[in-house]
Amino acid sequence: MASHNASQTTKAIVAKCLASVRAHPAFDGLVSEVNGAVAVNNIVPSFSGPTEGWVGYHNKMAGYAHSANALRAVYETCVKLGVKFALGSDRGEVTRLVYASSPPSKECVGVETRRGEIYRAKRVILALGAAVGALLPQIGSQITGRCWGIVHIQLTPKEAEELRGIPVTNVLDLAFFFEPDKTTNKLKFCHMGGGFTNFAGSRDGLSLPYPRLADSDFVPLEDDTYIRRLLREALPQFAERPLIDAHLCWFADTADSDYISDYVPGTDSSLVVLSGDSGHGFKMLPILGDFVVDLLTCGSQDNSKWRWKEACMVKEPNAWRGETATQELAGIPRSRS
């Protein structure tokens, strides 16, 4: 969707997305154009705000993934299958890759953790999201660590029930949200846009997440502004409610929003990198493992889009996120909500 105040560029992006899904036979009869408040209210009667001038489309096949529950289910299944996890800041935090000592070989033979413990392996797989450059600086021309701000508002059980089952609502120039969490009754919001980088203090000229999780417990002030504007448009009764549980959500961004799933060149096929989620990769969780198995079985990446690429520094994000430019986190005003 685009709000009535959205630029023509943003509205054109939404129209392009609509044309794309309409052209795919899988969406036949499941996508409808939305133009104005009456159309919005017909789809989501629980929106009490004006939504005047909203334009876009309703895709009945769209949805969301509950990331916390999904990851918990994967973890529990892995444990049952015998996978061993080394967790915690000492046992689980990897500080460097370990390579064979005999040059000129660059064979990766394991990893070392913060407390000095070395885990050895015939093949090492790096799946570190936005932090991948900390262990593999040479990927910096392909991956930029970016983040968006995430906030929540607390609803009562009655308020949450009234919004149960609403469609994922993404107003491209404002923010997106979806139905409240069934356990906490919290409503989650994210203003996407161009995102934010953290190049400050990087020794290798890379944008990386803050080293401590607690350092990311805030959102930029502009996110607060966009989210409250969306609330006034859709759910004005919550527009002044405190924004809680604020944090930055980091992702590994590529120039084309495609993954990097390949062997790292020059490592004798001993090191594999899985990265480039680009802020939209989690929906692939149920099938991503199959792609990795194919890579390990074949010994090379057949999909050219997912190969290791040289000299393709990510500058600005793709248009599907809107037209706002990326900003550097250092020095930006922070929300106090």
Task: Cite the ranges covered by each PLM segment.
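Short beta-strand to alpha-helix junction loop
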Residues: 5-12, 57-77, 215-223
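C-terminal catalytic lobe of FAD-dependent flavoproteins
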Residues: 226-337
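General small-molecule cofactor/ligand-binding pocket signal
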Residues: 32-35, 84-88, 242-245
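A general structural signal for well-ordered alpha-helical segments in protein cores
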Residues: 11-18, 37, 71, 224-228, ...
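Short, hydrophobic/aromatic-rich segments at coil-to-beta transitions
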Residues: 106-111, 164-168
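Dinucleotide-binding Rossmann-like beta1-alpha1 core, especially the glycine-rich loop
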Residues: 1-43, 53
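A conserved short coil-to-beta-strand element within the FAD-binding core of flavoproteins
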Residues: 86-109
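Active-site substrate-recognition segment that forms the wall
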Residues: 119-123, 128-269
